């Protein structure tokens, strides 16, 4: 299960530069997020290692930071693109739709380095690219609050009042998902009404 808060927290986690490798994100997700085009490589492959790195420095400095499998965000600087390939980057993202030379494409193929072209600038790509991580990575699987189809409303009302979730998953006897239960709809339900009758009175007998 995932909440809006979980998604917002994920987008704010700017310090996790290896999010794509940890979540085994497919390159197709990256292409969708940054409106990119795969120039070299297979878009169906998954990212399994490396971090996201902006290649704004000169090659002499950049080579101290690029590691095996990294995704390097660059502009039109040939020397930075070449540095990424030589340092075994897993993918080079060329921003602002800058042209990519045949030499760079050839070297990338020979070194198993993917190349993606995107019309967005480096800042925009850096902000968008983390949103390509699959939802499954953020899903919560433990300590979930669930209800059974056989639960009585009176028994779960206190839980609904304490926990500030909007919806709760409902499971069958086998633990399989059946649907969602709205907290608001249940809290607004009428309480049980009891009518006392005197069966000794003919008019009240059932």
Predicted features and spans:
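Tandem CBS (Bateman) regulatory domains
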Residues: 3-28, 48, 119-146, 157, ...
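Gly/Thr-rich phosphate-binding loop signature of adenosyl cofactor/nucleotide-binding cores
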Residues: 10, 17-80
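Feature captures the catalytic cores and cofactor-binding loops of soluble hydro-lyases/lyases
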Residues: 54-139
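Extracytoplasmic Gram-positive cell-surface binding/anchoring modules and repeats
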Residues: 148-151
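Short, small/polar residue-rich loop motifs at catalytic or cofactor-binding pockets
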Residues: 162-165
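Short, acidic, Ser/Thr-enriched surface-loop or helix-capping motifs
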Residues: 172
